[in-house]
A protein has these predicted regions:
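A conserved, well-ordered hydrophobic junction motif at loop->secondary-structure transitions
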Residues: 60-84
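Non-catalytic linker/capping segments at the edges of enzyme domains
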Residues: 1-62, 66-67
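Active-site helix/loop of acyl-thioester processing domains in fatty-acid/polyketide metabolism
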Residues: 38, 75-100
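Intrinsic-disorder/low-complexity, polar/charged segments enriched in Ser/Thr/Lys/Arg/Asp/Glu/Gln
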Residues: 54-60, 104, 118-120, 134, ...
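HotDog/MaoC-like acyl-thioester-processing domains
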Residues: 1-8, 17, 113-115, 126-157
Length: 157
């Protein structure tokens, strides 16, 4: 399922343009629904109340970076890699009807990301505290973890 992009984000130069590749990124929403059981004591006997909740929040996309994203010859530029992490994590929040802005973002680089070869970006919600949301993401190419990131976002309303 494609992730919905809020109306006020439709002009984003990263999300709505071919910033990393020849066409805009199409983030896919991935979620697992699980039935959670809550126990409440009612009149001296236990009753189980079942409720369905989304327990995993994840967004992913596959792209083939072009020379638009090139830094050193044949290698994706580090700032653009970080931008890709930021975009994926934001779309993970969009998946969960949260509009937010980046507060902090830390990227780690494990292996160079080759231009012209498919990569997969995955972002996952970790937790929220009040209006701050914690997320993490990873970029995998040829089965190798090439880059990882952690971020905090602040709800915009």
């Amino acid at each position: 399922m494609k992730v919905f992009i809020p109306h006020n984000h439709r002009r984003c130069q990263v999300c709505s343009q071919g910033f990393f590749a020849d066409s805009p990124i199409c983030f896919e929403a991935v979620g697992e629904r699980e039935t959670l059981v809550n126990h409440k004591a009612l009149a001296n006997h236990e009753a189980s109340i079942k409720s369905e909740a989304l327990v995993k929040y994840e967004t992913r996309a596959k792209i083939v970076p072009t020379d638009k994203a090139e830094g050193y010859d044949g290698i994706m530029q580090g700032g653009i890699v970080t931008t890709l992490h930021d975009s994926a994590m934001l779309h993970c929040l969009f998946q969960n009807s949260i509009t937010a802005m980046t507060v902090s973002l830390t990227s780690r680089f494990h292996h160079p990301i080759a231009i012209g070869k498919e990569l997969e970006i995955r972002a996952q919600w970790v937790k929220s505290r009040r209006s701050i949301h914690f997320l993490e993401s990873k970029i995998i190419q040829n089965g190798k973890l090439c880059s990882s990131a952690q971020s905090q976002f602040m709800s915009s309303h």
